[in-house]
Each structure stands twice: as structure tokens, then as C-alpha cells.
């Protein structure tokens, strides 16, 4: 069986409604690149009130949407979302909820990670 080697990279996955979390994501990318780390910046599409995707699978502009393969192949993960009433934004939760089989198969095991957020409220 042939093993496919992938380039090591830090996956910076974020959702941003107003741009604050996007700015943090790019600041993290700048810092990682200064340390000679390869970086992939990805986002997730918006969802409707019924928590279903409301945007095309390929964005017309801006960051590329994250795929499960991006998560599988990353060497580390930085995850960012605005905080809304003490929780992450619905589009990020919707995406993460779709990755249950990655968790069940330990696809992210031994990969360092961090989270970042921005909020305008106390919680």
C-alpha cells in the first residue's frame, strides 16, 4: 500500500460575520508564516435559520470553504468563531457537526489546536 505524503500545514478555519474574526485569522496566519509554517486559511458558508447551507459550495470571492479533507490533511488547527450568547456561530457549529466521522475515526488525533474568538458581549 502506497502512503501519500501531504505538505504539513496549519489549517486556520474561521467564520466571521462582521470581519473581526477574519482579521484575527489573518493575523494568526501572518505570525505562523513568519515562523516558516505553511498555512491554509478556510471558512465555512452561512446557514439558514433551519441550519441548512444557503451559499454555493464554491465561494465567488474571499476564502475557500473548508473541506473534510482539509481537516484530515492538516498538521495543526486554529479554529475561530464569533461568540454569540456564549456559543460559537451557527455556521461553524453546522460544519463541525458534519465531521463526526472524523472524530470517530481519530482523524485529528495528535494534531495541536487552538481556538480564537471575538465578541461584543459579556458572554
Regions found by a protein language model. Name each.
Residues 109-123:
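Short, glycine-/small-residue-rich phosphate/pyrophosphate-handling segment
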Residues 1-108:
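N-terminal beta1-alpha1-beta2 submodule of the flavodoxin-like/Rossmannoid cofactor-binding fold
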Amino acid at each position: 500500500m502506497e502512503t501519500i505524503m501531504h505538505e504539513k500545514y496549519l489549517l486556520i478555519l474561521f467564520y466571521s460575520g462582521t470581519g473581526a474574526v477574519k482579521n484575527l485569522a489573518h493575523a494568526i496566519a501572518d505570525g505562523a508564516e513568519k515562523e516558516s509554517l505553511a498555512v491554509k486559511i478556510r471558512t465555512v458558508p452561512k446557514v439558514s435559520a433551519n441550519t441548512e447551507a444557503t451559499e454555493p459550495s464554491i465561494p465567488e470571492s474571499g476564502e475557500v470553504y473548508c473541506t473534510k479533507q482539509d481537516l484530515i490533511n492538516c498538521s495543526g488547527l486554529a479554529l475561530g468563531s464569533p461568540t454569540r450568547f456564549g456559543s460559537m456561530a451557527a455556521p461553524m457549529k453546522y460544519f463541525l457537526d458534519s465531521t463526526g466521522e472524523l472524530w470517530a475515526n481519530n482523524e485529528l488525533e495528535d494534531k495541536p489546536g487552538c481556538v480564537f474568538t471575538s465578541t461584543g458581549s459579556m458572554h
